[in-house]
């Protein structure tokens, strides 16, 4: 039975990571075609990526959009979760459901709706528009994560802080937020991950300044290009580093 479990785990992880391994392997291809046989290793295409102005600009744009939209999503999600947890609102179950609806809607539908709305109000395609779109898709996730961690014990501590003379903004900023730090960090990390490689909304809402996934798409439209493998390997490496950072922070905050 143990051997079957090991075989099953090996097949599962192989199925998940084999495409990534192949992508990383052929990112070191020396020739101009990312197909067998493998000839290398060579850093030729990594150098080509670094020297490609559009790819590096797309990378910077992706980082800026991911950071800004994730921060906004966490802030708005935290405030919404705090409001629902501390106040009784008419029809609050329906209101909570409405906040989480975007989690079940296709990004294509959300992107098209935002595109129509922005055209109606005269807002041009830009990184700002893409950032707003990323907030729309990430805010429900942040809200769900933070709201699930709010409990009665926090209300008791908040009430004690008010009894000691703390203002409401001090209670929220100095009491509630620190207690929810693990949830806030997890929400920010997941939001960053989703925003980092999101393509559909970025493609619909940007024009001249685009994000890295859109630039990769534009690169692939002209045919097979080893630079796409190098970019994919770099993006995967960044994602792994973020995951390791998240685990290290979680381990440091975990009680002994």
Question: What is each model feature region?
Answer:
Residues 2-13, 79-114, 158:
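Cytoplasmic-entry segments and transmembrane alpha-helices of multi-pass inner-membrane transporters
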Residues 31, 46-54, 196-245:
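Interhelical loop and adjacent transmembrane-helix boundary motif
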Residues 20, 66-82, 108, 112, ...:
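Hydrophobic positions within alpha-helical transmembrane segments of bacterial inner-membrane proteins
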Residues 1-8, 91, 147-162, 166-175, ...:
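C-terminal transmembrane helix and the adjacent membrane-cytosol boundary/short C-terminal tail
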Residues 8, 13-20, 135-136, 142-147, ...:
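Transmembrane alpha-helices
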Residues 1-53, 57-60, 64, 250-256:
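N-terminal, non-cleaved signal-anchor transmembrane helix
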Residues 34-38, 43, 91-92, 108-138, ...:
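Membrane-interfacial helix termini and adjacent extracytoplasmic/periplasmic loops
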Residues 28, 53-86:
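Transmembrane alpha-helix signature in integral membrane proteins
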């Amino acid at each position: 039975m143990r051997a079957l479990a090991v075989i099953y785990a090996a097949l599962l992880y192989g199925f998940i990571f084999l495409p990534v391994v192949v992508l990383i392997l052929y990112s070191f291809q020396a020739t101009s075609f990312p197909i067998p046989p493998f000839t290398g290793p060579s850093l030729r295409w990594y150098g080509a990526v670094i020297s490609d102005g559009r790819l590096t600009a797309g990378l910077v744009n992706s980082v800026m959009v991911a950071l800004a939209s994730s921060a906004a999503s966490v802030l708005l999600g935290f405030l919404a979760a705090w409001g629902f947890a501390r106040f009784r609102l008419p029809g609050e179950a329906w209101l909570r459901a409405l906040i989480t609806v975007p989690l079940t809607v296709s990004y294509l539908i959300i992107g098209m709706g935002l595109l129509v709305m922005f055209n109606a109000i005269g807002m041009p395609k830009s990184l700002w528009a893409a950032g707003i779109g990323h907030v729309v898709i990430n805010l429900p996730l942040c809200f769900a994560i933070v709201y699930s961690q709010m409990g009665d014990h926090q209300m008791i501590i908040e009430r004690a802080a008010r009894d000691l003379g703390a203002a409401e903004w001090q209670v929220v900023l100095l009491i509630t937020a620190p207690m929810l730090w693990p949830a806030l960090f997890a929400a920010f990390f997941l939001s960053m991950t989703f925003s980092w490689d999101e393509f559909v909304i970025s493609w619909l809402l940007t024009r001249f300044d685009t994000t890295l996934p859109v630039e990769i798409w534009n690169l692939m439209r002209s045919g097979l290009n080893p630079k796409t493998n190098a970019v994919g390997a770099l993006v995967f490496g960044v994602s792994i580093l973020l995951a390791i950072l998240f685990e290290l922070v979680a381990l440091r905050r975990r009680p002994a």
